């Protein structure tokens, strides 16, 4: 799938590293006077972290430093409408990811979580010069959501949380009812490990510290199982951004993911676990829950309302945060201005 690193371009052009936090110093203040709004915030794969203590929200995006090393940049908001640059929160030049090449290797899809009192950003990368294909790893911050984040191993070969030697992207964190952490990820559709260019979703159990793998991965689903994903004309069924959420009211386990529906339009779909566990089996909903955008996640805002964040559309991605509800285990977009959601159902 064609990906445009808009967040990196934005950081490099509008917010040069020289004007902000250097190295691994934590970002402690808002340094951008003019707020970005959903209409002006050009970003892909936006993941919203809620800070109840400080009553604000963060989005951490990909960026790069003056020395052209991979980095992460944070944005902060108190209302989900106005986003202020909070500076760099990670600089790869200081750790095992220093070998990630700005031109050759990917740097995608940072998802940030609070887990056991620490903050972790799951990010997709690669280290082709070291023979390591695309993978997802976790960076850790002991000091708060604004970092500094750091890799949890000194050796690049120990960094991937997805299976070694397998082309994987878009890992997200899921913690099941007994406290077991999992990384839910995509075995990429154009990688050598899949059949007939059909992407797959898998899950890998992690250590309690999120710094390694435990046991063998488990298969979740294939993209061509979904009725709403016809595949590209020249072949290929995409799985992007698998994200698992437990609905507290129904107790059901739902999974959102992104792919391309009729007309090669990016969209969000849903599955439900028939056992209520990550092992499934997973049942597809026949139609997408959102069309013309994707790489979604769910969160409760500071008032307890359920929201879905994604980029809209897929060609010129901007931040979009939608009101959603889950009724009888099925997610539905309730934002009044979005009529296509109702039409798709």
Ranges and model annotations:
Residues 4-13:
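Sec-dependent N-terminal signal peptides
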């Amino acid at each position: 799938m064609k990906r445009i690193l808009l967040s990196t371009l934005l950081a490099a052009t509008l917010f040069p590293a020289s004007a902000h936090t250097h190295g691994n110093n934590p970002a402690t203040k808002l340094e951008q006077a003019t707020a970005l709004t959903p209409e002006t915030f050009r970003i892909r794969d936006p993941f919203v972290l809620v800070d109840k203590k400080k009553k604000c929200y963060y989005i951490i995006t990909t960026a790069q430093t003056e020395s052209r090393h991979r980095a992460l940049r944070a944005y902060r908001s108190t209302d989900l409408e106005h986003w202020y640059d909070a500076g760099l929160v990670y600089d790869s030049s200081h750790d095992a990811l220093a070998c990630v090449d700005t031109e050759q290797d990917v740097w995608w899809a940072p998802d940030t979580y609070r887990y056991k009192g620490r903050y972790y950003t799951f990010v997709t990368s690669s280290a082709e010069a070291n023979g390591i294909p695309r993978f997802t790893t976790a960076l850790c911050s002991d000091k708060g959501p604004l970092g500094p984040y750091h890799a949890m191993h000194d050796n690049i070969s120990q960094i991937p949380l997805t299976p070694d030697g397998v082309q994987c992207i878009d890992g997200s964190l899921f913690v099941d009812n007994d406290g077991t952490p999992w990384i839910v990820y995509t075995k990429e559709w154009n990688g050598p490990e899949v059949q007939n260019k059909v992407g797959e979703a898998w899950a890998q159990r992690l250590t309690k510290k999120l710094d390694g793998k435990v046991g063998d991965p488990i298969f979740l689903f294939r993209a061509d199982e979904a009725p709403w994903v016809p595949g590209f004309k020249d072949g290929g069924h995409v799985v992007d951004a698998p994200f698992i959420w437990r609905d507290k009211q129904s107790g059901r386990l739902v999974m959102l993911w992104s792919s391309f529906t009729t007309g090669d339009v990016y969209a969000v779909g849903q599955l439900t676990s028939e056992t209520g566990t990550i092992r499934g089996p997973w049942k597809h909903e026949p139609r997408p829950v959102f069309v013309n955008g994707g790489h979604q996640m769910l969160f409760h805002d500071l008032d307890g309302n359920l929201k879905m964040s994604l980029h809209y559309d897929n060609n010129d991605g901007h931040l979009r945060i939608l009101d959603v509800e889950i009724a009888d285990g099925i997610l539905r977009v309730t934002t009044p201005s979005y009529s296509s959601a109702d039409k798709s159902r």
